[in-house]
Amino acid sequence: LDHEYKELCAEEWAKGGSFFCYTSDNPTSLASCCRVLNEMSDNTFSSTTGMTGVMTGSCNVITLNINRIVQDYIHTWKNWEDHIVDGKCAFPFEWFSESFSDLKNYLINILERVYKYHIAYKTMLYEMEDAKMFSDCNAGYIYMRKLYSTIGLIGYCEAAQFLGLSVSNNKEYKDFLKLVFGTVKEENKKNSIHDSKRPFLFNSEAIP
């Protein structure tokens, strides 16, 4: 056991960042080195490395900076400058949480644009695959229909700190994360197109 590395990981985890750990007693989802997470409807385990014979992965990633989104959302408020002191929100989180539904709608509007970009890009990839322009696809190693279009998420710790939250195991922080990740999860399912020939499947990637 590398005790020095263990202590480093424990220290960083205690601060709420830098390292990501995903564990599951019931493997009903995908997890890869790039932290792709997506529920599996058939309750089976698959590896994104392809070593199990299951071909999965991402054909494209668009990353959203949650910190930027939260601050841009607050900039839509009337006299928003009055609510910022020393670069952070100057009002209790309970007040902000009352506008969660508005922030959710703001995030959904951004996600709707992201899905359009993803669909347009993957449509181009499908056309290139049909034209036999990908040697790996021609050889049967990869199929575009098996690949996900991924939405990366960064800056959620910084967004929480901007709102005056402690990045730790506490109710307020977890409520904020549930809002962000829950909204993305719902919209991924809602906007996925399960076409037999040209499916468009979305998942999310949490980047520490």
Q: Which residue ranges define each predicted feature?
A:
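Core structural elements
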Residues: 138-159
